[in-house]
Design a protein with these regions (language model features):
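Hydrophobic membrane-insertion alpha-helices, especially the h-region
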Residues: 4-21
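Glycine-rich, small/hydroxylated-residue low-complexity segments
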Residues: 18-490
Length: 490
C-alpha cells in the first residue's frame, strides 16, 4: 500500500512539474517560431502564441513578400500534424511555411487577410475564413509571370482536401481590368482534390472599375457535386493563359435573385437559373437547364424606345420568357441528343426544338471535355434528326395587329400580305424546288390559321460535318439534303 501511494505521488509530482513548465515551453516555442519566420527578412509577425496541448499556433499581424504582398491580422492553426520536437524547435510546418509544402490541421482561422500581385493589380481579400479538416498535399510551387497567383491558386486547389470551409466578406480584384467581385458569405463542404461536394454563396456582386454601383448581383448560388479537376489542371499549367478551361462537371446548381445595373438599365429582370445532371451510368447522363421568369420591360431610355413602341402595338407591356432544355449523352453508343428545348413567351406562344446525333466519337468528347475546338473537324458526329415546333398562343394575332398599326391597313390585309410574301419568298443561292414551295405554303397557312407548325429534318444519310459543307455551295437543295418536311395542326 505504501509503495503504491509513493508511486501515485511520484506521478502526480511529475505531472505537476510538467504542467508548471508548460507555459515556459510554449513561450520558448513561440520565440523560436517568430525567429524562424523572420529569419530571411521576407516575412514578419507581430506576436506568436503557442498551445502545446492542442498543437495550436496563433500569429498576429503577419506579413510576407514571398509570393505577392500578403497580410493577415490574425492567423490561428490548431491540431497541426507534426511532432512536439518540431513545435518546440520552431521548425516546419509550425513556422516559415513555404509554398509547395504539405499541411494538415484540424482547423485554420484567418481574420482580415489580403494578398495582392503588384505586377497585375490582382488581389484577394477576406474578412474571415474558417477551415475544418485541412489536408493539403505537396504541390509544384514553381510559377512565374503575370498569372502566377492564378496558377498557384489552381495548384493549391488541386492538392486540397477539407471537410468544411466558410468565408465572409471576400473580394477579388481582377488582374489588369481592376473590376471587383464581392461575396458576403461562401461555404464549401467535402472538398477533395478538385471535387466539391457542396457550395453555397450568398450575396455576390460584380462592380466595374471606377463605378460605385454593382453591374451584376445574385442573391443566392447553390451547387452540388462539382468537378473542377480538368479546369484546375488547365489553369495550373504555365501555358494556360488564353486556353479554354474545358468542361466543369456539375451535379446540380441554381442561382436566384438577379439584379444590378447591367440588367436594370436594359429593363431586364431574372428570377432563377438552374441546372441538374443525373448520371445514369458511367458513360451516360441526362441534364436539364431551366431559366424562370426572365422579364423584359423596356425602359424610358432612347435605346428601348423602338421595342417599347412595338410591344405597345402588340398590346403588351413586357415580355416574360421561360427556358427549359434537356440534353442526354450515351458515350458507349456514340449518341448525343437534345430531347427537348422549349422557350415559352407569356401571351404569345412557345417554341420547341429537339435533335439527335449519332457517331459521337472520341474527337467530339475531347472537344467537349477539354474545350479543344481543333478536334471537332475530325469527329464523325452527324445529325440524325431534328424537329422545330412553333405553338401559336396569340403571337400571330398580336404581330399582325402591330403590323397593321405601322402600315395603317386593316389587320386582315396585313395578315394576307404577310402570308403572300412567305409563299413568294425565294432566298438567293437556294434551289427552289416543288418541295421547298410546299414548305413555304405550310408556313404561310400557319400565319393565316395559327395553330401548331412542325418542321422536321431527317437527313438520309445523317448529316455529318463534312457533308454540312455542301450547305455553302451554290444552289443547294435544302429539302433533299436535310430531309425537310412541315405539317400544320390546330
Amino acid at each position: 500500500m505504501r509503495k503504491g501511494l509513493v508511486a501515485v505521488l511520484a506521478v502526480a509530482a511529475l505531472v505537476g512539474v510538467g504542467v508548471a513548465g508548460l507555459p515556459v515551453a510554449e513561450r520558448y516555442a513561440a520565440s523560436r517560431i517568430k525567429a524562424e519566420i523572420e529569419r530571411d527578412g521576407q516575412a514578419s509577425v507581430g506576436t506568436v502564441e503557442v498551445g502545446l496541448i492542442d498543437r495550436r499556433v496563433v500569429l498576429t499581424d503577419f506579413r510576407s513578400r514571398a509570393f505577392g504582398d500578403l497580410t493577415i491580422r490574425r492567423w490561428e492553426t490548431s491540431g497541426i500534424a507534426g511532432s512536439f520536437g518540431d513545435l518546440l524547435a520552431g521548425r516546419r510546418p509550425f513556422s516559415s511555411f513555404a509554398l509547395g509544402d504539405p499541411l494538415r490541421a484540424d482547423r485554420v482561422e484567418l481574420a482580415d487577410a489580403h494578398i495582392a500581385d503588384p505586377s497585375t493589380g490582382a488581389s484577394w481579400s477576406v474578412g474571415s475564413l474558417r477551415i475544418d479538416g485541412l489536408d493539403l498535399a505537396a504541390y509544384d510551387a514553381d510559377a512565374t509571370g503575370p498569372h502566377r497567383l492564378a496558377i498557384l491558386a489552381a495548384r493549391i486547389a488541386a492538392a486540397l482536401r477539407l471537410r468544411h470551409a466558410e468565408a465572409r466578406n471576400a473580394s477579388h480584384v481582377l488582374a489588369f481590368a481592376g473590376d471587383t467581385v464581392f461575396v458576403r458569405s461562401a461555404a464549401l463542404h467535402g472538398v477533395d482534390r478538385g471535387k466539391i461536394g457542396a457550395l453555397v454563396i450568398a450575396d455576390i456582386e460584380a462592380t466595374p472599375k471606377g463605378t460605385a454601383e454593382a453591374s451584376l448581383k445574385i442573391d443566392d448560388i447553390r451547387a452540388q457535386e462539382i468537378g473542377l479537376r480538368r479546369a484546375l489542371t488547365q489553369v495550373g499549367d504555365r501555358s494556360h493563359p488564353g486556353r479554354p478551361l474545358g468542361r466543369i462537371e456539375i451535379g446540380s446548381a441554381s442561382a436566384t435573385g438577379f439584379g444590378g445595373t447591367l440588367l436594370s438599365s436594359n429593363g431586364v429582370s431574372l428570377e432563377s437559373v438552374s441546372l441538374e445532371t443525373v448520371r445514369q451510368t458511367v458513360d451516360s447522363s441526362r441534364s436539364r437547364l431551366r431559366v424562370e421568369d426572365l422579364v423584359l420591360r423596356p425602359g424610358a431610355n432612347l435605346e428601348a424606345a423602338r421595342l417599347r413602341v412595338l410591344l405597345q402595338a402588340m398590346g403588351l407591356s413586357e415580355l416574360r420568357l421561360g427556358l427549359d432544355c434537356t440534353g442526354a449523352e450515351r458515350r458507349s453508343k456514340g449518341e448525343l441528343a437534345v430531347p427537348e428545348c422549349s422557350v415559352s413567351v407569356a401571351d404569345l406562344g412557345e417554341m420547341k426544338l429537339s435533335a439527335e446525333f449519332e457517331g459521337a466519337d472520341e474527337a467530339l468528347w475531347r472537344a467537349v471535355d477539354n474545350g479543344d475546338a481543333a478536334a471537332l473537324p475530325r469527329s464523325s458526329v452527324a445529325l440524325a434528326s431534328a424537329k422545330l415546333m412553333l405553338v401559336d398562343r396569340g403571337a400571330i394575332d398580336r404581330s399582325v395587329r402591330a403590323l397593321a398599326a405601322v402600315t395603317g391597313r386593316p389587320a386582315a390585309d396585313a395578315r394576307a400580305n404577310l402570308a403572300s410574301e412567305i409563299r413568294g419568298y425565294q432566298p438567293p443561292d437556294i434551289l427552289i424546288t416543288q418541295e421547298f414551295t410546299k414548305l413555304l405554303d405550310t408556313a404561310a397557312r400557319f400565319i393565316e390559321q395559327g395553330g401548331t407548325l412542325v418542321v422536321e429534318a431527317r437527313p438520309d444519310p445523317p448529316l455529318g460535318l463534312a457533308a454540312a459543307s455542301r450547305l455553302g455551295i451554290a444552289g443547294p437543295d435544302l429539302v433533299h439534303l436535310l430531309g425537310l418536311s412541315a405539317t400544320l395542326s390546330r
